[in-house]
């Protein structure tokens, strides 16, 4: 019962809404907790004990950190964080670590071998672990008061719309609203289900249709080169964006039905003018978490302060800032890569963006001088278009390695990009051999155009749903029915289509 399945939004969600509304206000958070645990148990069964364990550790750590002495508070926080990280590291990374240590032992003929064990990963562990660590850190920094009711904390960590794919919430984002138990309002229901419908369009009409092309190109990578590698990278990037952002639409819409506002996870990332801006618009909640709990602490660490004091005396301000930035960014991008999975491709992906962003920072003063010398206005349309196109190249290259099954395959595909690059393959019928016909490709292109128009309005701070709700009843119903019609008629599901799992649910 994934978010995009009819059983979720036509059966499960309405049942929860009815049960929630019928319950007394003071226990509605308990109703949400009950259904959230039921939802989790459907996917993870006995692995729910890890969620229960993480919740208990988080609760006790928060309470002890808030009441402990100054010296003990830090020790308690460190123990709590490492208990949570320990579960995540063992479940997600122990096999990867053992494989690479064994490879090293084999290289030096040491004769030792670690057992390689693969664990079934509990649903959402990468998401709720970060939320739990953020909660404990916020209590330690006295940004929030510790939650006294463990059930309310459990709901914050397990709320069913966010447990599978996020967004990664801070306690201050949702906890108070979840605990209030406000009445369900018709406007919230309408806005919520409109958002769910929009997410379904992106997921089942576009992303699931592109899945066929992506699988064909990446599974048969050895047979493709030149412009077809570009098609592979672009197709996967669009598939990933449409699926992940579509899922976020469903998630945010589901929460909105209860009057709960979740943080946005995407903000039109493909209008970004550089890689840094892209990551401020893409998977926003993950970037915010890394910035708050890794980047800022490292920036204020003893190592960084020592470097700054040394650099002020012996180097230029430029070198001081670049090295300080590298010190803070490096652990962020290592963690970003490994958070996605135990794979060298993911680690390379993180290091790729570390290098790209550092190059952008280093070149920024020179670019500004160049623009001033050539009298290029920063807001000139042609200049911004060039910067956006440059960022697209960076994004598509990164996603090529991100999607490749191994780093070696990613390297092979990247090298193949420069072999026999014939743009003619885009219209000579080659695209029609990838699993989609002309009609299917046409559906994708028209749907992308619709999404692009809506994203343009959102970039202009226009509330599209609000505009629709202000229209007369016949117009509103025309929009509702059109959205339902598009999803039902053009969705890539049923006979002839392969069911596509949610990509980020695997992280």
Label the model's feature ranges.
Residues 1-506:
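Membrane-embedded transmembrane alpha-helical bundles that form the catalytic cores
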